[in-house]
């Protein structure tokens, strides 16, 4: 993984209120919420070691990578061909209509194996308020909850999570035709 990939190696997903940058190797390395000009939650784009990130990628990332959007959408598809197989990571942020559009923002990430068998790894390391605010982790079998001053985030989905300090990680092996989704929600 390139510690500081060029902006050209990123895709943009958003929900009309804020946006996230997704590197071509499956790392969300910039996300601010609840608005574009809010303090960051993930900022590895600026500080790889301390800025925080959300990784969903094959365990062995060697190979060819390409990003594209589903036609006429803001749904980003990151495709890869590796020695283990061919897979995709699909990223998007659902749009919430109405007056509560800024109350909750979701990063939806789907890992899918097209051919072969691929082990996907996940690492969620939020660093709230430009990494200036400490957070506390509550981990249950259903979800991980990150508590920071003035912010709460939840991570849940089809990939089993385990504690890694105040962060979480996980992994899941997918065979051809299988998919697993995770959702990061800012409240």
What does each of the following model-derived ranges do?
Residues 3-187:
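Beta-sandwich/jelly-roll carbohydrate-recognition scaffolds of carbohydrate-active enzymes
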């Amino acid at each position: 993984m390139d510690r500081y990939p060029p902006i050209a190696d990123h895709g943009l997903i958003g929900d009309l209120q804020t946006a996230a940058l997704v590197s071509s190797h499956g790392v969300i390395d910039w996300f601010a919420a609840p608005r574009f000009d809010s303090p960051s939650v993930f900022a590895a784009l600026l500080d790889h070691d301390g800025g925080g990130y959300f990784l969903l990628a094959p365990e062995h990332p060697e190979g060819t990578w390409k990003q594209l959007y589903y036609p006429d959408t803001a749904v980003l598809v990151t495709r890869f061909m590796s020695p283990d197989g061919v897979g995709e990571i699909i990223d998007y942020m659902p749009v919430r209509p109405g007056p509560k559009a800024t109350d909750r923002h979701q990063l939806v990430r789907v890992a899918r194996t097209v051919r072969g068998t691929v082990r996907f790894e996940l690492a969620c390391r939020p660093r709230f308020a430009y990494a200036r605010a400490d957070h506390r982790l509550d981990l249950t079998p259903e979800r991980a909850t990150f508590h920071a001053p003035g912010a709460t985030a939840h991570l849940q989905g089809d990939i089993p999570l385990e504690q890694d300090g105040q962060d979480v990680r996980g992994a899941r092996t997918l065979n051809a035709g299988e998919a697993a989704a995770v959702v990061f929600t800012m409240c």
